[in-house]
Amino acid sequence: MADDLEQQPQGWLSSWLPTWRPTSMSQLKNVEARILQCLQNKFLARYVSLPNQNKIWTVTVSPEQKDRTPLVMVHGFGGGVGLWILNMDSLSARRTLHTFDLLGFGRSSRPTFPRDPEGAEDEFVASIETWRETMGIPTMILLGHSLGGFLATSYSIKYPERVKHLILVDPWGFPLRPTDPSEIRAPPTWVKAVASVLGRSNPLAVLRVAGPWGPGLVQRFRPDFKRKFADFFEDDTISEYIYHCNAQNPSGETAFKAMMESFGWARRPMLERIHLIRKDVPITMIYGANTWIDTSTGKKVKMQRPDSYVRDMEIEGASHHVYADQPHIFNAVVEEICNSVD
């Protein structure tokens, strides 16, 4: 990370940094515990150790439901297992649900990723497959949101025999970057803010550079998150969770930066590769009707997979975080898909 703006300072400044940046893995653990205590169904939270010494923080809900294909949920950029709290009980009513912090995010290990787009992507995918092997999951219904959707698709290209149904929720990184600016959807304020600080720094570097003002920045730029989870939390629990997830060593964030082009696009767009997924893998794409993501991608995927099952749909009243904007509708749609599998 020698050429990043986030080099660790030396000497007296390095000992002062923990006070300047009010975060720690312990604080992330504590705020996540407040979130997970809202679960009604039986759950198990633990580290899954991979052969390469990395650890993947994993939450399994309803582990006793062993008769059906499990649902595996992969969060998006800057997220973690806690953001599925509005969905986990409902979606684990009839089957086991697994979710985990992606390598480099949340409470999982934060190793150094390859600096090239393909290498970074492969590292993510390899960690998901090794996690699956270690967990002993033969097949799964694989759901990914945003960056998680991009990685779930990449995984399905490489390991199609493990995926009973691929569910992509407002997936990032599919279309090619338009050459005509008029074809680009206007991004929300927080995306513009991230884009404005890009360059040599990581996307969320501002949270770490801001020190004690970092938590306030989350609340300022993403006040919608507090509203989305208001049924569960009246305080700043979710804002705190997002801050502590992203104020740590920016390992996965650096990998994402290697994979992206101007935040909204991928250097290796998935539309150029989605045809490589085996024909018998069904795909459902779920978008928020008000998302900043290009929803025409669903129709383009259908065109590229004429002999395969591809369904795309939009949920009214939802933006990019469909699962939190309209959780009841989202849960019903995903449950219907899962029931079609078994």
UniProtKB/Swiss-Prot annotation:
Alphabetical GO biological process terms: lipid catabolic process; N-acylethanolamine metabolic process; N-acylphosphatidylethanolamine metabolic process
Domain AB hydrolase-1: 70-323
Swiss-Prot/TrEMBL keywords: Hydrolase, Lipid degradation, Lipid metabolism
EC number(s) per entry: 3.1.1.-
TM segment ranges: none
Family indicated by similarity: Belongs to the peptidase S33 family. ABHD4/ABHD5 subfamily.
The protein, known as: (Lyso)-N-acylphosphatidylethanolamine lipase
Species of origin: Mus musculus
Gene: Abhd4
